[in-house]
Amino acid sequence: MWRLRLLVLAVLAAGSAEAQANSSDGFLEFSVGKFTYFVLSKSSPQEAVLRHISSNVTFLLFQIHSQYQNTTVSFTKTLLPSTSGTGNDRGLVFILRPEQAVCTWYLETGDTKPVQSVALTLSYSERDPIPGGCNLEFDLDIDPNLYLDYNFFETTIKFAPANIGYARATEPPPCDVSTSRESRWRLRYDVYQYFLPEGDLTEASLLHHLQRMAQVAQVKASAIKVATLTADDKTAVSFSSLPGQGVIYNVIVWDPSLNTSAAYVPVHTYACSFESVDGNCASPGRVSTKVFSTLFALLGLFVCFFGHRFWKTDLFFVGFIFLGFFFYILITRLTPLQYDVRLALTAVAGSFGGLLLVASWWRFGILTLCMLCVGLVLGFLVSSGTFFTPLGNLNVFHDDGVFWVTFSCIALLVPVIFMGCLRILNILACGVVGSYSVVLAVNSYMFTSLSYITLNVLRRALNTDFRGAFIRVPFQTNDYIILAVWGMLAVSGITLQIRRERGQPPFPPHPYKLWKQERERRVTNILDPSHHIPPLRERLYGRVARIKELFQKEQPAGERTPLLL
């Protein structure tokens, strides 16, 4: 029994040694299909060697990954643009010569800090397509890499077209001589997306999940296919950016004639910087955003439970959203102001919009106009939620005209449906929109996918290129919890207000008419004590006189004792 235990321990030790790799004297030895963890430093570059390559292998794909520090992989010790690649996720394709059984790569980093890395070597036969084999855009002759670029709005990946496979010691098939079924134009490209756990920014987690996105079978089993491209399509795909959320992308090139596939080098992003001071990956929300969203959520929470009873507060909330949304879009598209300045101006404009809607109700009392604004705000949220579903990724909605017309029709449909029961419309808007403001506030402190229900619409209004982006977000444990909280707040607020308003007038009376009637009553009714109240000017003069008396010295009153006792 003890011999069996020793044997098991020896096997485990051997496996661990293979996984970590022997890096003594700057030398790493790899095995095909096995991930190797190692630490790369500026002072000690590494030499990676793969031995005992099978004779039926035509080309090798070597790749190295790190979290955010750059690494370099090269065919030669002297770095050249055509024989090396530098980045977080980089790889090289090596076309084997006849009888070649050993292959060598050189690894290094220019970062002053040690870089925890993971590397992998994959082998392919002559029937497999070659990722990046028809590269005409990037530096490498054969470039299997995905080039990723992101901003606040979208994340874009680009890659070089592949070529069909060929045997050792033969010339590669021409890339652009013909478009027949015997050329690379028959190839198809499947784009995959994989989400890391929400809120997990650890290096170990990333390197672990990258193993699920490197080989064809694992990519198909773990990730979600977002799009399929043909050789006629542009080799670039855009996605909505998710700051603070880790995402891994990869492309599988498929040869339908031979039914063979090969994977490009996976690439990852968090759509944020690990090294910036404000708005970094650990805390993606700015301080100004946190203050704004927190105050907005407090107002929304009050409206959620008491909006219909405090009708003017409800109107202020709706007017704030209505004018603030359009004002932010306007100043963002027309001015180069900084984000914090734009947010402050939006708060001022939103407050003005809220006061304007309250003033219009006080003076004119047009209930239909006020409820149209309330219904449009609720309709905006309903329409945004509709396009948050897979419906929003349909190709027809990549056209701005079709999208905005459909979006507006859905938003207008809500007030039209509820025009016969305005009180129910207002209570629904208070409960749903007011509780959603809490979701937006949560997003400034921790990532939640639910905030992108409205943020994606805002991005589309701000950036014309966003129309072509695929809108996909993770839905994990945090999102289920926040969705439950949102639903609980909305249902509680709606139920409470419906029960409280039972038997009450649907809406308060026109304030200006009440004020006018009260003024006429005081003028005509001399028995009313308020009739004898002095005019406002006299009351102000009287108060000023009383205040002045407080600062005057007491005057002497003459003799204070009687002369005669």
Curated annotation (Swiss-Prot):
Signal sequence segment: 1-21
Q: Which GO terms describe its biological process?
A: cellular response to unfolded protein; negative regulation of programmed cell death; positive regulation of insulin secretion
Ordered alphabetically, the record's keywords are: Cell membrane, Glycoprotein, Membrane, Signal, Stress response, Transmembrane, Transmembrane helix
Q: What positions does the record give for glycosylation? A: 22, 56, 70, 259
In its keyword annotation, does this UniProt entry include Membrane?
Answer: yes
Q: What is its main location?
A: membrane
Output the Pfam families linked to this UniProt entry.
TM7S3_TM198 (PF13886)
- Transmembrane region(s): 287-307, 315-335, 341-361, 364-384, 402-422, 427-447, 478-498
Localization, per the record, is: Cell membrane
Instruction: Name a GO CC annotation attached to this entry.
Output: plasma membrane
Stated membrane topology is: Multi-pass membrane protein
Supply the InterPro entries for this chain.
TM7S3/TM198-like_dom, TM7SF3
Q: Which cysteines are joined by disulfide bonds?
A: none
Q: Write out the coiled-coil annotation as residue ranges.
A: none
Question: Zinc: present as a keyword of the record?
Answer: no
| Record's function text | Involved in the inhibition of cytokine-induced death of pancreatic beta cells. Involved in the promotion of insulin secretion from pancreatic beta cells. Is a downstream transcriptional target of p53/TP53, and acts as a pro-survival homeostatic factor that attenuates the development of cellular stress. Maintains protein homeostasis and promotes cell survival through attenuation of endoplasmic reticulum (ER) stress and the subsequent induction of unfolded protein response (UPR).
* Name of protein: Transmembrane 7 superfamily member 3
Traced from the root, the source organism's taxonomic lineage reads:
Eukaryota, Metazoa, Chordata, Craniata, Vertebrata
